[in-house]
């Protein structure tokens, strides 16, 4: 399987899991009326509509801000997809696929509802993490993959020594 195909599978799986989880939790359950749902002592399902970007930054109430964020997301998707198509390693392609799938999932929410549906809340005692969704988790995992790929040694280029002299000039 090519690196690109692996990245494409990661992209499509991320997008499908993200949208399915959001649609099921919002339209297929009574979470909106009965939240929070306690999953574990440190995790709940809740309903949060994020009108901003990561960590709730740049909250947008108006239509222009909403569509500007959709446009920026789609521009990033295009650029990262081109990079994924040219990726030289499976790790890089999968990392980019996770990021693109997550960005598309959140852009779909923003275009359809005016905000991103976040629902996973992790906490322990007084500590509380921001509320996120499958797309956000995939984006973070993709960034970790990008970092790991950047730390890998570059593959050595094959020797171009045709003359058999070890690459040294002739005397």
Swiss-Prot record:
Compartment(s): Cell inner membrane
Biological or metabolic pathway of the protein: Protein modification; lipoprotein biosynthesis (signal peptide cleavage)
GO molecular function, one term: aspartic-type endopeptidase activity
Positions annotated as active site in the UniProt record: 118, 136
Pfam families: Peptidase_A8 (PF01252)
Topology class, membrane: Multi-pass membrane protein
CC annotations in GO: plasma membrane
EC number: 3.4.23.36
Record field: catalytic activity: Release of signal peptides from bacterial membrane prolipoproteins. Hydrolyzes -Xaa-Yaa-Zaa-|-(S,diacylglyceryl)Cys-, in which Xaa is hydrophobic (preferably Leu), and Yaa (Ala or Ser) and Zaa (Gly or Ala) have small, neutral side chains
Entry keyword set: Aspartyl protease, Cell inner membrane, Cell membrane, Hydrolase, Membrane, Protease, Transmembrane, Transmembrane helix
Origin superkingdom: Bacteria
Biological processes, Gene Ontology terms: proteolysis
Class of enzymatic activity (EC top level): hydrolase
Residue ranges crossing the lipid bilayer per the database entry: 7-27, 64-84, 88-108, 128-148
Stretches of the chain forming a coiled coil according to its record: none
PANTHER family (UniProt xref): LIPOPROTEIN SIGNAL PEPTIDASE
Purpose: This protein specifically catalyzes the removal of signal peptides from prolipoproteins.
Family designation: Belongs to the peptidase A8 family.
Annotated protein name in UniProt: Lipoprotein signal peptidase
UniProt source species: Methylorubrum extorquens (strain PA1) (Methylobacterium extorquens)
Gene that produces this protein: lspA
């Amino acid at each position: 399987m090519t690196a690109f195909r692996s990245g494409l599978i990661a992209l499509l799986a991320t997008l499908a899991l993200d949208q399915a989880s959001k649609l099921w939790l919002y339209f297929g359950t009574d979470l909106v009326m009965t939240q929070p749902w306690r999953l574990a002592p440190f995790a709940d399902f809740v309903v949060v509509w994020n009108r901003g970007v990561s960590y709730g930054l740049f909250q947008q109430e108006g239509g222009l801000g909403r569509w500007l964020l959709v446009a920026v997301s789609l521009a990033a998707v295009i650029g990262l997809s081109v990079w994924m198509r040219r990726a030289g390693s499976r790790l890089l392609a999968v990392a980019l696929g996770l990021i693109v799938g997550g960005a598309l999932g959140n852009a779909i929410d923003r275009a359809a509802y005016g905000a991103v549906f976040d629902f996973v809340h992790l906490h322990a005692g007084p500590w509380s993490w921001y509320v996120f969704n499958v797309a956000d988790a995939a984006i973070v995992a993709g960034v970790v993959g990008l970092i790991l790929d950047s730390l890998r040694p570059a593959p050595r280029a094959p020797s171009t020594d045709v003359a058999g002299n070890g690459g040294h000039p002739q005397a």
